[in-house]
Amino acid sequence: MKKTFISKQAKEFRTKYDIANSRVQGIRSYQKSLIVEEFKEFIEAEGHLFRESDKLHEEALKELADLVYVCYQYAENMGWFLDEALCRVHESNMSKLREDCKPIYREDGKVLKGPNYKPPYLQDLV
C-alpha cells in the first residue's frame, strides 16, 4: 500500500527526532495528550473567529481518522488549502533542530523549537 505524503512526513519526523513507535500505554497516553493539547489550541483559536486489543486499536484508528477527516472538512468549508498548510507546517517542524542538528526535548519528550526554527507562512492560504 502506498503511503500518503502525510504518513511519510509523520515517519520522517519520528525518525529524525528519535521518537519510537510503541503500543505501550504510557506512550499512547503521551501521544493522546499532544492531540488534546493541539485540539485545545484549535478550539481557542477558532473561538476568536466567533485496552490492548485489535478491536480497540481498530476503534482508535477510526476515531483518529474521523478527527483528520473533520479537520479536512473544516478546511474545505473555510476554503483553506490544508495539504499545502501541512507541507509548510512539516517544513517548519523539521526546522526545530539545534545548531548541531540535534533535537531539543521538553521533559515529557515533546520536541521544542530550536534556534533554527522557522514558523510556517500560511497567510496566503487563508
Regions from the language model: what does each represent?
Residues 1-64, 68-126:
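Flexible "arm" and connector segments at domain edges
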